[in-house]
A protein has these predicted regions:
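Active-site nucleophile loop of the alpha/beta-hydrolase fold
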Residues: 142-153
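Catalytic nucleophile-loop/oxyanion-hole region of alpha/beta-hydrolase
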Residues: 85-112, 117
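Short, surface-exposed "cap/lid" segments of acyl-processing enzymes
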Residues: 25-86
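Short alpha-helix in the alpha/beta-hydrolase fold that links the catalytic acid
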Residues: 64, 219, 233-242, 253
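Acidic catalytic loop of the alpha/beta-hydrolase fold
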Residues: 228-232, 260
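Short beta-strand/loop motif that positions the catalytic acidic residue
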Residues: 217, 223-225, 229
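Catalytic active-site module of serine/aspartate enzymes centered on a nucleophile-bearing elbow/loop
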Residues: 2-4, 252-281
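Gly/Ala-rich beta-loop-alpha elbow adjacent to hydrolase catalytic centers
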Residues: 120-124, 128
Length: 281
């Protein structure tokens, strides 16, 4: 517990430092939106490490975290580096920075609870699968709307913008770099309104790195997807499901027309499915 307290205080310090360094008036959200947090459940037998998605913040998964806490689980929600601050911060981060954030979160929850289930939303789902493939002690994994195949305009645009920036660099131009595209999020009180193109490339790198590891993943797994997700292709999460090496795996398709299915109407059904999965394993 002392280890957990120390690591949590370090994570909070790092966030406060990043927040003040990258704060942009009128663009950064209130500091509490990005704060990592621990939900103390009744039991310390099973803990959950729960990760937010890209361009979001821990607040995005708070409803699920509170629900899991209410049915008895300890839950730790880390902040992914570059998030909860400003898009300019995120533009400078690699997916390895996000992996490091998740690994520190795992160190925290595993120092509190005997068994740990890891899970996440969107890019956080990819990070949870990556952790479960690397760390054999993980008890199970759930992945909601994992971004194996992106269909959002800005991700299709990313390679072209990347190429444009390289051409501009080669020309030694001080001309305009196209570093961000506009983001119109479902939850503007949480998510960034500018999407750094470099960040989209990092999601693709993360998922490319993850794919060959999936056949080695042999813990119970739950893959959750929205049927008409406007951001990630459902066939991408089905591909993840098929590639998973574990025999104990479930694929749940929910009839939503949005990406963020952990918030808003009907999200309680998704929370319940995740709770049932954790209880079962």
């Amino acid at each position: 517990k002392k280890v957990a307290d120390y690591l949590i205080s370090k994570a909070v310090e790092e966030y406060e430092s990043d927040y003040h360094r990258y704060y942009i008036q009128g663009e950064s959200k209130p500091i509490d939106v990005g704060m990592p947090f621990l939900v103390k459940g009744k039991s310390k037998n099973v803990g959950v490490l729960l990760s937010q998605g890209y361009m979001a913040a821990p607040r995005e998964v708070e409803n699920l975290a509170r629900y899991l806490g209410s049915i008895g689980f300890c839950v730790y929600v880390p902040r992914l580096k570059g998030h909860g601050t400003s898009p300019d911060d995120l533009a400078n981060r690699s997916y390895q920075d996000w992996v490091a954030s998740i690994d520190r979160g795992y160190a925290i929850i595993s120092s509190i609870c005997k068994r740990v289930v890891v899970g996440g939303f969107s890019t956080g789902a990819g990070l949870a699968l990556d952790l479960a493939a690397r760390v054999k002690e993980v008890a199970g994994v759930f992945a909601v709307a994992a971004p194996m195949t992106l269909k959002d305009f800005s991700s299709k645009f990313a390679p072209a913008v990347d190429m444009w920036n390289r051409i501009m660099d080669k020309a030694y131009s001080v001309g305009p770099k196209m570093e961000f595209v506009e983001n119109k999020p479902e939850n503007p009180h949480i998510n960034y309104l500018r999407n750094p193109i470099s960040g989209v490339r990092e999601i693709e790198r993360l998922m490319d790195d993850l794919e060959p590891k999936l056949p080695d993943l042999d813990v119970p797994a739950l893959i959750v997807q929205s049927r008409r997700d406007p951001v990630v292709e459902p066939k991408g999460s089905l591909k993840i499901f098929k590639l998973l090496g574990t025999e104990d795996k479930e694929y749940r398709l929910f009839n939503f027309d949005r990406h963020g299915i952990l918030l808003g109407d009907g999200s309680q059904r998704v929370h319940k499915a995740i709770g049932e999965f954790i209880n079962r394993i």
